[in-house]
From Swiss-Prot:
Its main location: secreted. This is Short neurotoxin N1. It comes from Pseudonaja textilis (Eastern brown snake). The keyword Secreted applies. Binds with high affinity to muscular (alpha-1/CHRNA1) and neuronal (alpha-7/CHRNA7) nicotinic acetylcholine receptor (nAChR) and hinders acetylcholine binding to the receptor, thereby impairing neuromuscular and neuronal transmission. It is found in: Secreted. Keywords: Acetylcholine receptor inhibiting toxin, Ion channel impairing toxin, Neurotoxin, Postsynaptic neurotoxin, Secreted, Toxin.
Length: 11
């Protein structure tokens, strides 16, 4: 998963 500016996206 990717963490970007406090945003977590499960891909």
């Amino acid at each position: 998963l990717t963490c970007y500016k406090g945003y977590r996206d499960t891909v």
